[in-house]
């Protein structure tokens, strides 16, 4: 497994987020070689359901400085008490949720979406780096345990160094990549009735007030309290008993 980080810098967060939502997936059994880049779709399920009511609620603090949040479709995660939950943050898939989490200064840290259906083809692999990968056993499905990962992909064809490398963290059901190249990031995980995502992007160019000083590499970011809290929040995701 390639765990060394590419030397290129990261793409801005908005482009990273679009990449996470619609641009990637696990390799098809017979990937095409005629297209210069991976293609994918991300659509909501067509199952008809009643309009979701505002049933999501925050519970009492789980530990000092932290709270728990339960979504309308009965998933729960813990988060720092001074962070903000926006639910809904946009149009959710039928029967699913669309939740954004921001810090006290309004910096977007993660998105949780459920009841999503994805499809893709891996037509071109890219150099990659894996900074962290840990299992999330609470989300196990039929013996398959997804994992939280913080990783990167490098587009060697990019002419702008700022657009060369994508940094992102989230939960994935995709196998951990090996060798020197990998398919584009697939930060989705299997969850009934289809799939879900919970993660975000690292942008060293982000200038939100309150950011820690001199943090401009993924290695440095991993040492910040922000990243540690994001990881704790994302890996705390579990179904409500």
PLM regions: where:
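Bacterial N-terminal signal peptides that target proteins for export
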Residues: 2-13
